[in-house]
């Protein structure tokens, strides 16, 4: 891809995200979402492979439908109440339409169908953008409108996302699809708590971005697209694979790693809200995710599949140290002890 075109796309992504996050008017928020959609499409289809082109078309159609729903819900609300302010979403029909639109944008169940397919059709770096930066504008809109949304609908979608994200990830062999279902499950946890404690949702989202970025960058460094490649990547970068294993366990939410903090706090908040049954169900559903994260972590260690005698092993080659991955891996593993400081800052 032309470096100038790539630079323009990345600047447009940042611009669209900033416009949506900082706007109070529905039209400006919608404009930011549209800029984002149009900026990411060249990055998805940059390889010109049929799978990439198919992914970009799917992404465009789904996001266009979601944007139309955002515009329709805001116009319905303005027609009924005369308000164009994002925080004044008081009309019930507009509220339901917006919930559906944001669920499509984020890839929440039952609107998750497009997300694994699009991630599978693109490169690891673009998949990283789709899983992190592209989730920020819809999440910001969800945070601003959360007091007006229906708690029952959001809780149902959150539980379904946590269940399906864990269940569908069990039989996947492609790392991008596994991370797509991981993203769906994590978004379920965030949606669950957004009405009761929006700041906790934001903290969970930031930590999710941190851990997901670490995993994607590590996989990109070792060029790992399938589990079979992950099995043989230890010989290429043993230290990186050890750090990747810790990050995957952190994503699973195992103590004493960073990923345990948001899950622990969310379960605590749900219990405070007297939603003990929901807290129990979502905690049990996280075991599904734990299984495939453990499987990934097991494959990332020194696990070689059965090979013929003439199989060419990927021997260790000394690579220059990647400082950014080292910093991200450290943060993904050791932030739990300072959780009281993080909570005090919220």
Swiss-Prot record:
Catalytic activity: a ubiquinone + NADH + 5 H(+)(in) = a ubiquinol + NAD(+) + 4 H(+)(out)
One of the protein's GO biological processes: mitochondrial electron transport, NADH to ubiquinone
Subcellular location: Mitochondrion inner membrane
Transmembrane portions of the chain: 1-21, 25-45, 60-80, 96-116, 124-144, 149-169, 178-198, 200-220, 242-262, 274-294, 325-345
InterPro entries membership: Complex_I_Subunit_2 (IPR050175), NADH_DH_su2_C (IPR010933), NADH_UbQ_OxRdtase_chain2 (IPR003917), ND/Mrp_TM (IPR001750)
GO terms under cellular component: mitochondrial inner membrane
Swiss-Prot/TrEMBL keywords: Electron transport, Membrane, Mitochondrion, Mitochondrion inner membrane, NAD, Respiratory chain, Translocase, Transmembrane, Transmembrane helix, Transport, Ubiquinone
Main location: mitochondrion
GO molecular function terms noted in the UniProt entry: NADH dehydrogenase (ubiquinone) activity
Function (record text): Core subunit of the mitochondrial membrane respiratory chain NADH dehydrogenase (Complex I) that is believed to belong to the minimal assembly required for catalysis. Complex I functions in the transfer of electrons from NADH to the respiratory chain. The immediate electron acceptor for the enzyme is believed to be ubiquinone.
Similarity comment: family membership: Belongs to the complex I subunit 2 family.
Protein name, as recorded: NADH-ubiquinone oxidoreductase chain 2
Organism: Struthio camelus (Common ostrich)
Gene name linked to the record: MT-ND2
């Amino acid at each position: 891809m032309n470096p100038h075109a790539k630079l323009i796309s990345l600047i447009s992504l940042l611009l669209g995200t900033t416009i949506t996050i900082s706007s109070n008017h529905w039209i400006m928020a919608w404009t930011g979402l549209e800029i984002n959609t149009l900026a990411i499409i060249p990055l998805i289809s940059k390889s010109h492979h049929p799978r990439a082109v198919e992914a970009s078309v799917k992404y465009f159609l789904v996001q266009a439908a979601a944007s139309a729903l955002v515009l329709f819900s805001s116009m319905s609300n303005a027609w009924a109440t005369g308000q164009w302010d994002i925080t004044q979403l008081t009309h019930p029909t507009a509220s339901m339409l917006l919930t559906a639109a944001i669920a499509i944008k984020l890839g929440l169940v039952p609107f998750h169908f497009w997300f694994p397919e699009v991630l599978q059709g693109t490169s690891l770096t673009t998949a990283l953008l789709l899983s992190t930066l592209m989730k920020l504008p819809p999440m910001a809109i969800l945070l601003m409108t959360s007091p007006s949304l229906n708690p029952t609908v959001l809780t149902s979608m959150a539980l379904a996302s946590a269940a399906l994200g864990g269940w569908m990830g069990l039989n996947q062999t492609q790392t991008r699809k596994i991370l797509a279902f991981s993203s769906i499950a994590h978004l379920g946890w965030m949606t669950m708590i957004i009405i009761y404690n929006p700041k906790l949702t934001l903290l969970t989202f930031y930590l999710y971005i941190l851990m997901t970025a670490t995993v994607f960058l590590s996989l990109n460094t070792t060029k790992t697209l399938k589990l079979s490649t992950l099995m043989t990547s230890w010989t290429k970068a043993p230290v990186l694979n050890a750090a990747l294993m810790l990050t995957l366990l952190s994503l699973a939410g195992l103590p004493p790693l960073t990923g345990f903090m948001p899950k622990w706090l969310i379960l605590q908040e749900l219990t405070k809200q007297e939603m003990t049954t929901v807290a129990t169900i979502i905690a049990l559903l996280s075991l599904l995710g734990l299984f495939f994260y453990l499987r990934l972590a097991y494959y990332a260690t020194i696990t070689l599949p059965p090979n013929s005698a003439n199989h060419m092993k990927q021997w260790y080659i000394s690579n220059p140290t990647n400082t950014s991955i080292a910093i991200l891996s450290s943060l993904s593993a050791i932030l739990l002890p300072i959780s009281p400081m993080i909570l005090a800052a919220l």
